[in-house]
Every structure is written in C-alpha cells, then in structure tokens.
Amino acid sequence: MLNVTHQLKKKLFLSDLDEKSSSSPHDEKKPGDGREVREEKSKRKALPALPSPAEEKSMNLSIARQRSPSGSSPEQVKAYGPFFLEYTLMAEYNQLRSQRLPGVYVLPAAKSALVWYGVIFIRMGLYQDGIFKFQMTIPENFPDGDCPTLVFKPTIFHPVVNIETGELDVRRAFPRWRRNINHLWQVLLYAKRIFYKIDSRDPLNPEAAEMYQNDKDRYKQKVNECLRRCHNELHLAVADDPHAIKFVELTPEKQDDVKNQIIESQSKPECLPTANAHKSGLSWMKKGGAIFSKEES
C-alpha cells in the first residue's frame, strides 16, 4: 500500500513539473520576443538533410578533385605514368634483390624495363640439374593490371607449363593481381617451386599430368629429355637484347680474363677501405694533429 502511494505521489510531482515547464515565460510568445525565440531555436542541434542524387554527385566530384594533384588535368597526370611505372619497377627489383632467392638470377632487358630475363637452377628432385631460362613480361598498367606472364625458353615438360608456348600458368597462384600485396619476386618464387612440388590438377599440359599420376617412369624419361634439350640450348639467347642471359663455355683464356678483372676491380682506389673512411670508422684527422686543435692565424 505504501509503494502504491509513493508511486502516485511521484507521478503527481512529475506532472506538476511538466505543467510548470510548459507554462514558463521562456516558451510564451510575446510581442517583441520573436528574436529571442529564433535564437533559442537556432541553438538546437539538428541533423542535416540527406543530399539529393545531384548533390551527392557534385560532392563526389569535389572530393575527387581534391585528391588529384592540384591544378593537374587528366592529361598531365597521365603524362607522369611512365615515371611512376619506372619507380615501381625499380622498387620491385630492389625487393627481389633483398629476397635473394637461391638458384634464381634475373636481369631487366636493356630495351624495355617491362621485360626481365632470368634463369633457374634446380638442385634436387625430378628436375635435378635442370637449368631453365625464361622471360617474364610485365603489363604496361602494372601494378593495377593483370598478372605478369612467364615463358620458359625452350619449353619444358611440366603439368602447369604449356608444351607449345612454354608459358607458365601464373594465374594458378595469382588469380587476381593485388596491388601492394603481390610482387614480382613472388612470381619468380612460384616459378621455382613448381619443380619441387608438382601439381597435376587442372593442367595446361594434360599429357604430363596424366603421365605423372599413372606412369612415373615414363614421366622421368620425358623430364630427362627436357633437361638435355635445355642444356643443349644454353648458349642461345632467348631474345636479341644485350641483357638476355646466355651461357658460354669457360676456357682457360676466359677464366684468366675474369680473374684479372676481379683483381683490377679490387685494386681500384674506390674499392679500398680508405675510400669510404667515414663509413668504415677510420679517422679523417691528419697524422700528428691534436684533438680540437686550431691553426693559428
């Protein structure tokens, strides 16, 4: 009974407060109070109205202009494309050098930075002692375009390599090239791993896949034939480019030439430790000089 009485009193008290607040002089409209009422309403917080489709389109265009280089037209931005691509490829090549993939050697072409020549050495497994030359071609809209293409020259006998063209199935490992996530050194690493872990699912060379699954001895024979063919064509360049990798027979005369070049390069002043004394920790002070000394004028 006491609880019911308390609740009734509470309701009456709240209703009385509502009546007082509604009848307060601040809410009454009186002559000359229009300015105060407008100022009171202007202080209230209100959400902005939703923009119309036309307004939203205008806002998006404004944001796009702010993000683009100031004062640059699309033609001007496009003109810088080759420089952006060049710096991107330089960064990719530096990443490749830092990875130091064993048995993989790559050199960009002299005529185009979008073409890289390379060779892979295989030291164990079914393809042991294999030396496979390849050419990797990078799309012009890299890194926003498709995957690079990698072609073995000469072609090799492998389930994921086209027997006619020598092209590696790069999309098997990179279905969609993702900027800042996928890198060129990963493509080269994948090209090396296919010789150690052979995947015969969805092959580019069905004959090689079927033979690998059902007749390993016959598969090994075909691989040995492939190795001999690649060894016989090592002296041939994959393209007419000064940077295309090719092998030459090492004769005693050529060996002496290489040895002399190494000796001469080590004897040059820039190769000596004193050439970079500030980097090696050597003192730059003159012999006999004192610390904090000053010549008298």
UniProtKB/Swiss-Prot annotation:
Q: Which InterPro entries match?
A: Ub_conjugating_enzyme (IPR050113), UBQ-conjugat_E2_core (IPR000608), UBQ-conjugating_enzyme/RWD (IPR016135)
SUPFAM superfamilies, sorted = UBC-like (SSF54495)
Q: Name one Pfam family in it.
A: UQ_con
- Give residue spans, biased composition: Basic and acidic residues: 17-42
Superkingdom per UniProt: Eukaryota
Residues annotated as coiled-coil are none
Region span, Disordered: 13-75
List all Polar residues biased stretches: 59-75
Which family is this protein grouped under?
Belongs to the ubiquitin-conjugating enzyme family. FTS subfamily.
Its recorded name reads Protein AKTIP homolog
- Organism this protein belongs to: Nematostella vectensis (Starlet sea anemone)
Instruction: Kindly list the organism's lineage.
Output: Eukaryota, Metazoa, Cnidaria, Anthozoa, Hexacorallia
